[in-house]
Amino acid sequence: MGSHCPLVSPSVGMISAGRQDYQKFFMCRLLGYLGQPLRPEQLIYRPEHSLIVQSYQPQEMTAGLLNADGFGLGWFDQESLPNPYLYKNVLPIWSDINLPHLSRYIQSSCFVSYVRSATPPLAVDLTNCQPFTEEGLLFVHNGFINNFRTTLYRPLRNLLSDASYQFIHGTTDSEHIFALILDNLRRLRQTSPGDSDWAKTSLGKALEASLLTLVELARQHDTFFSANILLADGQRIVACRYASRQPEPSLYWLANSERCPGGVIVASEPLFADQKWQACPSQSILVINSPEAIAVKVLANSVA
């Protein structure tokens, strides 16, 4: 079987009003897993439309042809929670000679991975390479803020706490979005100190609050953004598929498949042909606490 997944139809039309706005932006590809311990190479390398294949032959990118500006893998070890591990490189993922061995050695019940297609003029260096990690979280982002340096760069930084401001080491809009999420997460911790279900709901709430802030900032500064995000804390993954102007980048999920029993996969594109792949709805947040506990929340429509 080839790398194309014929049983799954694209969730986003490739021709639409406003598509020309996206031509100068490049989209990354994301992958997340939660479930029974799994070697990352089983999703990064083995499937017919694996993350490796998506790096050079993506099927549903709204712009760009290659994801060759670096990659990253972040994973949790149950014995070392809540501190995740990272492996990143600015090489194209297919050029790294260590990742095949590392991804075959690791076993993890929660990991995320990413291949990058950098938006010019952002630098291709390790500080800009995802996943980002802070406070026991892993973060990957596929999307952009239009004209970030001249639109939301200063407004976003002005909103951040000192801790989140100092956390930023690179120049990407992605890292600034993560910093905003961290601040919202800290506020939730302060307001819900005795909530036993706090951990199950806080990541989704912090992500939603951050998206609403971005919507308002984009409106104020006459710009737009897209944000497909994966957040993981080792016990759960929270994802979103969101854009303030269509089309949104593609995002899918699959639970308890024959090829991956006891697990949930979230990916920019289906890794293999399976009728059970589900496209995340537009403007939605996906909260995965286990393969049997998955919730989808569609946010109020704010697309321009």
From Swiss-Prot:
Glutamine amidotransferase type-2 domain span: 28-299
InterPro entries documented for this protein: EgtC, EgtC-like, Gamma-glu_amide_hydrolase, GATase_2_dom, Ntn_hydrolases_N
List of catalytic residues: C28
Keyword Transferase: yes
Gene Ontology biological-process entries: ergothioneine biosynthetic process
Pfam families: GATase_4 (PF13230)
Record EC number: 2.4.2.-
CDD domains cross-referenced by the UniProt entry: YafJ
Keywords: Glutamine amidotransferase, Transferase
Hydrolase recorded as keyword: no
PROSITE patterns xrefs: GATASE_TYPE_2
Stored Gene3D superfamilies: Glutamine Phosphoribosylpyrophosphate, subunit 1, domain 1
Molecular function per GO: transferase activity
Highest taxon in the source lineage: Bacteria
PANTHER family assigned to the protein according to its UniProt record, in alphabetical order: GLUTAMINE AMIDOTRANSFERASE DUG3-RELATED
Protein name: Putative glutamine amidotransferase slr0199
